[in-house]
Amino acid sequence: MPFCHYGPLLVLKINAFAKREGAKRGKDAYDILSLVRSCAEGPEAVVAAFGEEKREDNSGLEMALRTLEDHFTDADRLGPALAASFYLGSRAQGDSALRLREDLVTVAHALLNA
């Protein structure tokens, strides 16, 4: 049972990444990908819900969009790197890590264009 709509939850998770220091940033970055991947209604529903936050004028959205742009739009940026490191640990190199990083970049671009 969801406790929060997907759009506001994504804004919160992205902004948590922006404001944190240390190891928890990797979890926040991975949570963004996990939320989009695991939605029962499909990833499109989560992206659409994030787009609604733009129309609803969510006060946290400006920081979230800037964070996505600055940290998630390329596989070599901090967000995807930390997500891969969090999820894969010492195995954060190779094909699995690259795939995870690229998936997160795809999600970031979809959210930015929602």
Regions found by a protein language model. Give the residues of each.
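Catalytic cores of NTP-dependent nucleotidyl/adenyl transfer enzymes across multiple folds
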Residues: M1-S59, A64-D70, D74, L78-Y87, ...
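Charged, long alpha-helical assembly modules
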Residues: L112-N113
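Acidic, glycine-rich loop-and-beta core segments that form the ion-binding/anion-interacting portion
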Residues: A92
